[in-house]
Every structure is written in structure tokens, then in C-alpha cells.
């Protein structure tokens, strides 16, 4: 893996688990989420992330890995999981309001949604303005659409 501000990182199949475990329930989402570098995912080496973190993929084929382990993985970005909830516009809007969130970064995998339409429904912009900024990941966990509120770690 090549990056503009780092030395090359080598990831290969010897680092990967042969079978990638998946999360079995919403309650099994750990406190850490890892987003692999796109090159790792495209090379089919997600098992290297699950092996390095002792984690599980949120749902088959989505690429996000959750774990109980707080480890530095040079080929994945780590997030602290603040909140896990079933996806619903009303419940997410209520959570954002309760926490004073006025700016939102939306990441998604495995969920078909229009970001701009969701922002209109949530009544929230991209920039924080007078409130706080948050990052939400819309994805599936064990087949269920969920929202993971995360902080870069």
C-alpha cells in the first residue's frame, strides 16, 4: 500500500485469516471499528484486518471490522464506537439533537440511501456551525440496517 506521507506497507495473504468471522448480533459490536484501506479490501485481504484486530466483519462483504481490541493497524483507520442503534431517521434525528450535533459526516456501506436526502430528513448540514460535528456509519450488522456513531481514534 502506497501513501503520500508514509512508507510503503506490505499486506499479503499470509497475514489474513482464511475465513472472515462476522458479527452475529447488534449487541456484539465492539468498542472499536476499523475501516481498511481500499487497496486491502480490493485485494481480498480483509482477513488481515480481522486477524490483526481479533475482530469480525459487521456483515459479509461490507469491509468494516469491529473489535474489542484497540490496536494500531497501519492498513486500516480506527474509530471509537460511541453509539450503536437500529437505523431510523426519527431515532437518529432525536439522537443528534440530544447530543447537540449540527454537522455530520456520513459514511455508508450496504445501505442504499441518498446522502443529501438523508441530510434534509435529519435537518442537518455537513459543517458543525454552532454545534458539534459527528461521523455516522450507515451499514448492516447481522443483516439489520444500523447506525454506528463513531469518533476517529
Language model features with spans:
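SAM-dependent transferase fold signal centered on methyltransferase-like domains
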Residues: 1-153
